[in-house]
Amino acid sequence: MAQRFLVVGLMLLALGVGARSDDKPGKVPAVATNSGLERLKKLAGTWVAADATGKPTDQVVSVIKITAGGSAVQETLFPGQPQEMVSIYHLDGADLLMTHYCVLGNQPRMKADPASPPNQIRFRFAGGSNLDPAKDMHMHEGTLTFVDDDHIEFAGVAWEGGKPAETHCATMKLVRKK
């Protein structure tokens, strides 16, 4: 019996190696491209809150990094703070998705609207986990505006009871930390 499992295992291993025989050692598989994901990758770095005049403050709001072999962008919001959260941006086929791991304990998933203006990526609710969108407070949509290479704005819209929760909608103006 053990020999049968060993033989089957070796056959599967041989098939797997044969199927990848044209891969070069150390070569990372090609990652699908999407203009929105490529724009997000250019945001890698640390972003601080802007003051009323648009100048950078010392308050770190977002740390963005490229991860998973270039197939995803990880954003850590309010790093090191009690309200720290993470958003992961990645592709599902041709669609750019954002999954927001919220301090509320839910994980809304949003899909980028392909009709977004050229200087924006608008994300719209597309499901999630640990939430009932008809009842629970959750991030329902967000718009990332690219002002220039060193200035972005993110307008988030939270929903509760199946409609926008006006007191939980806000815009963050961020400046790239130099």
Question: What kind of region is each of these model predictions?
Answer:
Residues 1-7:
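Bacterial N-terminal signal peptides that target proteins for export
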Residues 11-18:
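Hydrophobic h-region of N-terminal signal peptides that target proteins for export
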Residues 22-178:
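Hydrophobic small-molecule pocket/channel-lining residues, especially in calycin-type beta-barrels
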